[in-house]
Each structure stands twice: as C-alpha cells, then as structure tokens.
C-alpha cells in the first residue's frame, strides 16, 4: 500500500490547515564545523521558519552578479529562461548551476552546505535552483505561496525535510520588490482546494494566480 499522504492538497474539497508533522531542525550545534549556526540561531530558525545572515560570504556577491548578467544574454533561447507574462523582461532563470560553472561551485560552498546539512541532519542535494531577476519597473510580483505545497503536489516531495537558501544580490527593502515571510507559518500546512491542471508550471512560472 502507498504511504499515507500527510499533507493532502488540491484534491478537491475545501481549504484546511494541517499541523506540521515533521521536525523543523534535525541537527544540533556543531562548533567544530565552520559556517554553522549557533544555539540561538537554531532556535530562531525553529521558531520563525527562517533566518537572515547579513554579510554572509560577501566576496561572492559581485562575481555572482556578473555571472547572472552573462546568463541573461546567453540563455535567451533556453526554456529555463522565463519572461514576464506581458513582456520579454526576464523573470527567472532556472537551473543556473547547470549552465554556469561558477554558480555550480558556489552551490557547493561550505557556507551553504554546512548550514543546510546541519538543519536537515543529513547530506543534501539540490532539487531546484533559480535566479529571480525581478527587473525594476517591469517586474511582476510573486503571490503569497508555500514552496512546500507546490513541491509536494506538483513535484512529489513527500515530507518537509527541505529548505530554501536564498542569496540576496541586491539590497532588499520595501521599495524594490522584497521577499516577505510570515514568521511561524512553517508550523502549519495550508491545504488548497480544487485540483491542478496538467503542466500547471508552464503558466505559474510566468504568472501566479490563486
């Protein structure tokens, strides 16, 4: 028999709130390992569902900015380059680690890997990588959403043993399209009503609709 779906969603019916069934932090402090979180940082991540690390690996910002500008020109005819729904302005670039040796090396940097391994209590792999360009004046918003709900329903990820590492390459503030989060929302799963059409991602990557 197939395993029970602990987080059913988009199977018709109505919306519902399901309490998280999985731990948030699987590992512990590792003072002997470089680039890991201390006790207070682990507690903050466990309670809030995210943690911000200012000035983390600042030497990588300029090289990554330059590399992304190269990808924006070299990947014009690739399916992995997603444009805005009403223009040719670039919205996202998927799998940049596949097309860029620099980004591939960066994705393996201990400053990322050691924290991810600590939080998940295991070795890790990349299930999805992307660059969100969000061009000034032309860029469109990303609606409120749960990454895991999409990964679970559309990609088949069974449990919440996953995380997102987000590298801010520009100042993130209230007037340039910042990322908003709801502290503590990771403790509940929002099960969505309705169903999902085949290849929903073809449209949702360009424009998100409730």
Where are these predicted regions, by residue range?
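Short, conserved beta-strand element in jelly-roll/cupin
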Residues: 119, 152-174
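Double-stranded beta-helix
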Residues: 172-210
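Non-heme Fe(II)-dependent double-stranded beta-helix
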Residues: 2-48, 52-144, 148-155
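Conserved active-site beta-strand-loop modules that form the wall/rim of enzyme catalytic pockets
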Residues: 140, 165, 176-180
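Internal hydrophobic scaffold segments of catalytic domains
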Residues: 1, 58, 66-69, 170-182
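Short C-terminal domain-edge/linker segments immediately following a structured domain
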Residues: 82-87, 157-163, 194-202
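Short acidic/polar capping segments at secondary-structure boundaries
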Residues: 131-138, 148-149, 169-174, 184-188
């Amino acid at each position: 028999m197939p395993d029970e779906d602990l987080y059913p969603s988009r199977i018709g019916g109505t919306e519902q709130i399901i309490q998280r069934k999985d731990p948030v932090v699987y590992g512990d402090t590792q003072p002997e390992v470089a680039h890991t979180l201390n006790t207070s940082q682990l507690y903050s991540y466990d309670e809030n569902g995210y943690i911000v690390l200012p000035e983390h690996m600042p030497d990588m910002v300029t090289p990554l900015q330059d590399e992304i500008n190269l990808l924006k020109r070299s990947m014009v005819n690739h399916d992995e380059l997603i444009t805005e729904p009403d223009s040719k302005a670039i919205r996202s670039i998927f799998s940049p680690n596949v097309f860029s040796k620099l980004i591939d090396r960066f994705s393996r940097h201990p400053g990322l890997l050691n924290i991810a391994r600590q939080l998940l209590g295991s070795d890790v792999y990349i299930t999805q990588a992307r660059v969100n360009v969000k061009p000034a004046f032309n860029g469109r918003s990303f609606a409120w959403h749960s990454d895991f709900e999409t990964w679970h329903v559309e990609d088949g990820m069974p449990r919440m043993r996953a995380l997102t590492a987000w590298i801010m390459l520009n100042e993130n503030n209230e007037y340039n399209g910042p990322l908003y989060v709801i502290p503590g929302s990771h403790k509940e799963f929002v099960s969505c009503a309705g169903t999902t059409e085949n290849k929903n991602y073809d449209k949702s990557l360009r424009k998100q609709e409730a």
